[in-house]
Amino acid sequence: MAISFRTLALLTLSVLLISISLGVVTATESQRNEGEVLTMYEQWLVENGKNYNGLGEKERRFKIFKDNLKRIEEHNSDPNRSYERGLNKFSDLTADEFQASYLGGKMEKKSLSDVAERYQYKEGDVLPDEVDWRERGAVVPRVKRQGECGSCWAFAATGAVEGINQITTGELVSLSEQELIDCDRGNDNFGCAGGGAVWAFEFIKENGGIVSDEVYGYTGEDTAACKAIEMKTTRVVTINGHEVVPVNDEMSLKKAVAYQPISVMISAANMSDYKSGVYKGACSNLWGDHNVLIVGYGTSSDEGDYWLIRNSWGPEWGEGGYLRLQRNFHEPTGKCAVAVAPVYPIKSNSSSHLLSPSVFKLVVLFVFQLISLALL
């Protein structure tokens, strides 16, 4: 039976009105009133141990908190999002305040002159589909906190050294970031004012090693008063130097991570409220501002390929202190510039834990031949 024009028009109008009504309800429900937000804020203050003493400071921070909450909820309402944002200890900070206190990565192009072919990806290389150095015992379980100090470079450096030391010796030792902050002043590292993992590796080599954080604990303060001379006999970990992964090449970076944790710089200014998922959000793909440690990679069935990154903002941030960042990006620099400045420490026999791809292929062929002969 044919539908009249009048009937069709009424049906269309009804659907439109229902859609508008649903939209109004959804919008109303998503908009919190001032009292609800204030209750959330008071609870957040308790959970994060915040206490403001300055006149009007609590009110000023509340306004910032509201703005950040709005940004979080607007992002999380997008059905096509690849990651979640959430409230955390940074939720009362402006973007400028966050960047000034928690970023600190510095890297001059001259420091990338030590590019090595050790992890240059070659056609035919066989690499694992996924890697997680936490499962192999090469990552200190406790996610560390840099605090309000731009010392991310020190944490990325110690994490990489902790990893290669465990891979080479079988011993996992948590190392001292504070020694680097206090004592590594000869290059372009400036304590809480920022620095780079490359120069930290140089310092550790030239200094004859680095002590554990049990001996030289972290304070997060930029005193420049080096206490390491008193601990000369307690050095526990040494390295032979450092090298740079071929830059702007995610396949070479993947190969490097298959061998050991790698220190990189990423553009992290927009990641203060990252909570979970594979980050595909806004960032610079040209140059980084924050040092972190890649400890693995993998593929999510929902969000695709990712890098597994250990941060130094404590376990309350992100996925227990970790970030999953989009991998196999369409630009050679990688997502958020992850492939621009990848560096790693080297230690005697540091490559002995994993067969080279070419040798691995020969071993696989040999095993298959043995199996074939056994079945004859």
UniProtKB/Swiss-Prot annotation:
Detail the disulphide connectivity of this chain as listed in its UniProt entry: 149-192, 183-226, 283-336
**Gene Ontology biological-process annotations:** proteolysis; root hair elongation
| Glycan attachment sites | 80, 270, 349
Q: Which InterPro entries match?
A: Papain-like_cys_pep_sf, Pept_asp_AS, Pept_cys_AS, Peptidase_C1A, Peptidase_C1A_C, Peptidase_C1A_papain-like, Prot_inhib_I29
Q: Which residues form the active site?
A: 152, 290, 311
Record's SMART domains?
Inhibitor_I29, Pept_C1
Stored SUPFAM superfamilies: Cysteine proteinases
Q: Which residues form the propeptide?
A: 28-126
Q: Where is the signal peptide?
A: 1-27
**Mutant phenotype after disruption:** Decreased root hair length under phosphate deficiency.
Among the GO molecular function terms of this UniProt record, one is:
cysteine-type peptidase activity
Describe, from its UniProt entry, the tissues in which this protein is expressed: Expressed in root hairs.
UniProt similarity note? Belongs to the peptidase C1 family.
Task of the protein: Probable thiol protease.
Record-given protein name? Probable cysteine protease RDL3
